[in-house]
Amino acid sequence: MASSVGWQTSASAIEIAMDRIKSEHLIDNIGINFIYVFDDCNEAKAAGLSSKLLMDANVSAIVGPTCNAAGLAVVNLAGYYNTPVLTWGLTISSSFIDTSKYPTTVTIVPVAKSIAAAIHEVMIQFEWTEFVYVFVEDEKCGYFRDDLEQITSDSNYTSLSRTIQIYDQSYTNLVRQLEKLKTVSRIFTVCLPEAGDIKRRFMLAAYDLDMTTDEYVYLFAGPKSTAYQQTSSTGDVVGIWVDWSENPDGRDEEAKLAFMRTMVIVATPVQGEQYAAFKKEVIERMKLPPYNCVDECKEKEYQEAAEYADQLHDTIYLYALILNKTIEEQGIEQIANGSNIVTRGAGIEFEGMSGVVRMNGIGYRLPNMNLANLDSNATQRTVAYMDIDSTSVNWTFAIIDQALIWDAYNGKLPQTRPECGYSGKSCPVNFFVDYLYIVVIVAVIIVLCCAAAAIAAFLVIKARRDEELRLDDQWIVPHGMLQSIIKGRKESHHSSRSLQSNSTTTTGTTGISSRSVFFPETETQGYFVYMNEPVLARKYQLRVPIFKQDRSELRMLRSIEHDNVNRFIGLSIDGPVYMSFWRYCSRGSIKDVIAKSSINMDGFFIYCLIKDIASGLQYIHHSPIKQHGSLTSECCYINDRWQVKIGSYGLSFMQGVEKRTEDGLLHTAPEVLREGLTSGTQAGDVYSFSIVCSELVGHSSAWNLENRKEEADEIIFMVKRGGRTPFRPSLDDVDDDINPAMLHLIRDCWDEDPKQRPNIDMVNKLMKNMNSGRSGSANLMDHVFSVLEKHASSLEDEVQERMKELVEEKKKSDILLYRMLPQQVAERLKLGQSVEPEAFESVTIFFSDVVGFTVLANKSTPLQVVNLLNDLYTTFDAIIEKNDSYKVETIGDAYLVVSGLPRRNGTEHVANIANMSLELMDSLQAFKIPHLPQEKVQIRIGMHSGSCVAGVVGLTMPRYCLFGDTVNTASRMESNGKPGFIHLSSDCYDLLTSLYKEYNTESRGEVIIKGKGVMQTYWLLGMKEESA
């Protein structure tokens, strides 16, 4: 034990650690006193001593024990007292990292499970499927065996075929044991003590048995492996193959060759002179206080530092770091809290004497292990780095070139099992030597069969080639056989002319009907007659060579047949431009149908069109075409039965070089735009399908460009850019009869992530479910006929309803017209007849004027003036209607009325005007001015009877006007009258009094009238009392 964890060879590592702690001022304010007890790796003794330390000495922490059984007893007891235990040395049992049992344990030792995981990872990395574990009677090697058996039993890749324990470590016994293993394995994992020359003896035994050839690999592993170095009695670091005893055996070179067949798993140590100086200082400081080990430590066995002295150093330093962290974060009162000390160690990392120390949060060191070997010059180098956490290993090759790793093996990785087996007797039989006659017979048969197969293959290939040529003739469209369709009809026939001549012919024998519709020809599309049938042509601006695989694709396209896929006719390659030809569909494309807006597309109509597109796309995706790649509304054609047929598919050799049009880019998926894919994808087709659907449900072009502020290139840029909220067409303005599930499907189909879009099979399934409950029309044609029948029946009702509305509106317009013109005149104008001026022999004309109107106007606002006149004349108009009179016009406050025209009424006109004048005078008695209640309205009235001429003047706002001296005389009667009086001319007086005796009149006498001279005039005072 002295060579591993002996007190005489390791205790001073504590003082060396304390010197470092003090120099770094980690715990300046805390004094640490050490109590040394010796358990001698005895489990009972260790339990008793630790009990006294915990109960009597009230220690803050226990460092040790260094053996597994004793250590487990102590950590079990310390857990009860919540006192931290820091283990080191030989305590490699994996039980120490079980925090459920031992929550106060901190171990700096790489446990056996970690070493076993590293060994297992080596086997996996180099593809060794089985190996043998060789170990001596040593506690740590036993733990390795147990954990290695557990890990390999759970592994699906490598297995532990055998474990061999060596009890006698003599050279003779090593030879005997290895000779047994020679026929068992070629990959060996070896666990031997680090001290002494046991490793050298083991490898020399293998060398002597010829077990150090390129077939053998020996993997040494241990928590404290010194790799390929050892410290001699003089303190020098020499190779592990060197015999530095007093009587060397002289086999150092043979031992070196043997060690070139080994690999070692080692912790990352402090390299070189620093580590050697530490080990030397450990021995020297044991002679100094507080140890004063002078006489005892002179013994030869105590002249080299213990194997695990560096771990004791790192344990003390780690404890100081944890204390420092605990005090800074929680205070000094927590430094004896065992479970808390464990968690405080999380994240601590430092360069110790045992290598890089990294701690996790459960008191367990995460070992950094290296895999090392010797190169062809016997120089140690690191092959790989391993970061280990319990059973998981993060492997990184330090040397990438496998040949360089195995340069000592001539650059070849040793195999798990040799080609000839472990015994060397299982080499493959040389079949050609042992069975030559069978080989000859079989060879002859094979030659004959090959000749027959070659002849048959030739015939099959020739027949297939002839068939391919025949099928090629079907898709090749000679340019000379095309006829161009000329727009317009002549005598109910379409005319066309050959592309190769100037002669004009009539295509009365072709398949073009008198009702065929051909849409405008563009740079990419045209219409022709081929084989007496109209065809649709797609033009290509580039010419590309057509290879064998392209011809195969064209033959395949000719075989495509589906109700919703437009038939491919062929390809013309001998004209000015390449043109592909497709079956002509009389109703054009979906884009054309939407643009014409002549079809009433309801929800079911749109559903049927979309279902046809989805069905055709599903066929394409499951056909050898795989994807469409450039689906737009322009390549979805509709035949005369309103069936959608998808065209412009396939021709991948043209798609790869043809530049997409602007309309095509508006239908292209964002990932296709970003990645520049020319052939497209199935997910991209589903996106294009959704854009076409948005056109149908929105009754608009793609993205509704006509009503958007963005240009097409801006939309393409925003779609290509993507983002958290992708830019997509609006589905807000759709008809109410569109199924909401259809809108959800469209949004799913244009999802930014292609993986989130439904495939076309799912789309068709969802489309079918949308119509599962519909009764009535089963297809679009039935639906169209049903709609036409309903439309015809409702059209009759609508016509009758419109006629009623028209009659009502006519009545309203007639009433308005009759108020503007006399009815007789208006009727003639409505009939389009001219209204000639007409002379009337006897009429009576009435003029009136508001007295003092200017004064009233000055007292009123313009709006009040208008309201005053409107109220006054509304009162007058009601009186006029009762007296067979016609109001000619009102000019300001002047009022002109006539009776006796345009309907002649004999001599009643004078009585009508007289009665009307009297009623007007009476109505003024009760008339009030709303804004001038104290004011009274008075008028002057003038009347005159005589002849006049009437006629319509003007075209815009025509007026029925009176002409003649009678009009002027009536006006003079009004202007020369008095307020509140009715002024009559002598002619009017004579006519009135001669015919009607009931009126009360009075002579005014002679009055000078302007333009007339002296005239005898009269006042109309009212009705006689007996008449009233």
UniProtKB/Swiss-Prot annotation:
Ranges annotated as spanning the membrane: 438-458
Entry's Gene Ontology BP terms: cGMP biosynthetic process; intracellular signal transduction; receptor guanylyl cyclase signaling pathway
One term of GO molecular function: guanylate cyclase activity
Membrane topology: Single-pass type I membrane protein
Catalysed reactions listed for this entry: GTP = 3',5'-cyclic GMP + diphosphate
Function in brief: Guanylate cyclase involved in the production of the second messenger cGMP.
UniProt name for this protein: Receptor-type guanylate cyclase gcy-13
UniProt organism field: Caenorhabditis elegans
